Amino acid sequence: MKSATEQDSESDFYTAAAHLINCPGIETEQTLIEFLQYRESSCQSIKITKRKIVEVLARLGCIDAVPAIGKCLWSDDVYLVENSVWALQILQCQDQIFIDQMIDILRVDTTNQRISIQCLATLNISRSVDVIRPFQESSVPGIKGAAISGIAKLTRNFTRVPEISLNLLLPNQMDRHFAIQDLIDVDAIDQLNEIFAAPVSPVLKMRAVREMYGENSASVVDLNLLSSLDSLFSCDLSAINCVHEYDESPSSEFLVRDLYNTDFSRCYLALKYLSSRSASEIFPMLKESWVEEAHNDYGAHYCFICLFGSIFDWSAESKRWIFEVLLSSISNLRPQFQKSRAASILALAKLNPSMLCELIPEILSSRDSMPWDMRYSLIQSIDNYAELEIALKNKMIFQLSDNDIDQFVQARARMALAS
């Protein structure tokens, strides 16, 4: 990287460090480590660059960086300390001096208690149990949840783990996100029903399922889990507990705007109300909002797709436009819009299942490159097509699932073929 005097702007150091994640190798690692060790400055550009470097080194899996990252635990930059604790967790640090410092950070640094608990528990530092235990009574949900999860992980006593699920219904969305991570960290499969019902992004729920089940055989995926996955992918609003409510019934204009809310609880609540509104009333404002904004807003994009599939009395003209949107969404490869692809398949299956069936040959040509939730949703959609002749249905499901190595796709296909 260039010297400070050669930088074109304060963000150049940071930008260079961020881009080096794409250049793995010894030279990259040495350059980043040297910056951490020898670049001393109180200016903000150096501080934020060091935070990024610590993250990049961890993502590169650079074990040689542990000594340099560990020294950052004594920094007066709390954000650098936070990133360093996380990085040492990722790199599986076993340096006792650094571990002692992380325990001290937990005792005295109120800004980094959650990440410190997570790190010590993940590294299985048994001597941290007595330090972590009192935090189970913290008034801060994210710290309390991490402590309960950490103690369960370290002691194998899971008695208090269900308490974490209470945080899934807190008004603050970040607290709900923390709760899901805390349940993932302790492999709380018995709390999956609570996770499925939580008003959070479906992506978080999918991650919880995948991390808790790991690479287990499809034979351990039971019908209850498949039913929950079906509800998740089809955005079954009756299965979601919203933590917000309206004082009075809002206008349709207000509800459409709430589909852009960053809190999924509010999005789901708006969806519940809009799904019972007249299709002729809300379609013009939905179309206008989609064209102006929602088509390029990945959160709202998903909510609009779910809404399109939850209303069945669209006019013929409205349906033609909606079908175009759904077909475009199914083939949308932009990473941030991936959760909308499975939702679009299920929405199209509800509104026009024969149109989806016509797409199957094209879909099969790119099946192996599709994300697992999309492949799952295709099988779910065909299975739910009651008017489809049984032999043709089974043929399609077999084609969609043949040689698929994903345990959930396998299990869903087995259920469909057995019915």
UniProtKB/Swiss-Prot annotation:
Recorded superkingdom: Bacteria
Keyword Secreted carried by entry: no
Keyword Cell cycle: no
Cited InterPro entries: ARM-like, ARM-type_fold
SUPFAM superfamilies: ARM repeat
Keywords of the record: Antenna complex, Phycobilisome
GO cellular component, one term: phycobilisome
Physiological role: Involved in the biosynthesis of bilin.
Protein name: Bilin biosynthesis protein CpeY
Gene this protein is translated from: cpeY
